[in-house]
């Protein structure tokens, strides 16, 4: 053990912590492209940037495929950036003059919104305008990541996972919390 040099981030003698921080690389797989390296999950989406929106528990990402919005794998075996299969998992964050956020699909140009079918309330991406049913607010989730909250009258409703095989995006009931999403910035 005498030949091992240890680089320390603290001093045993003074108890002082250095002014620098070293963070490990989150994804050390050299086969993954650089845009797969996420922005820290604590970073909220902002206008003008493009994101992959991922459920950190399942690893599934919000995807538009064949006109249907849902969750799909986002790993290298089933690459979510391959536009040849008709899928789009890149969402451009926009902001209107009243500061409401919207998420526009990079492939279709359609926004995430809701269908207003309150018996079976789902999210969809079928309109090319950023109107009230496509207005979102993002709030930090206590478990990390961020909740996507849609405007509903004078309040908010959260986005949850549900439906068939837990691959659909459903509107939460009044007062119910939502998923903690990670926003992974896509670098061009």
Predicted regions and their residues:
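Lectin-like carbohydrate-binding module/patch detector with strong preference for beta-trefoil
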Residues: 2-188
